[in-house]
Amino acid sequence: MRGAVLTLAFANFAAAPVAGAPCEVFEHKYFAGESVAIERNQSLPRLGRLNDRISSVKVASQCLMVAFADEEYRGITTTFGPGEYATLPDGWDDQISSLHCNCR
C-alpha cells in the first residue's frame, strides 16, 4: 500500500505545469512523460525527440497553440484553444511535428 501512495504522489508531481509556460506539450496522455514548455509567441519548426510523439497539451488563457502535422509548419493543422487536453482529438495523437504558441 505504501508503494502505491508514493507512485501516485510522483505521478501528480510529474504532471505539474511549468510555471509561466503558456503552452506545454507532453509525450504521453494525461500530461505524463517528457514535456516541453513553449514561451509566448514562440514557434518550434522541429520538435526533436518529441516529433510525432506528443499525446497531451496544455494551453494558457489568452493563448492558442497551432499544431502542424509536418516539420517547418507544413501539412495539415489544428488549433488548440486555452485549456488542458489530457488526450488529443482523433488523428492528432503522436502526429504533431511543429507548432506555434500565440498569445495576446
Please state what every model-predicted region is.
Residues 2-7, 11-104:
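Compact beta-sheet-dominated domain cores in extracellular/mature segments
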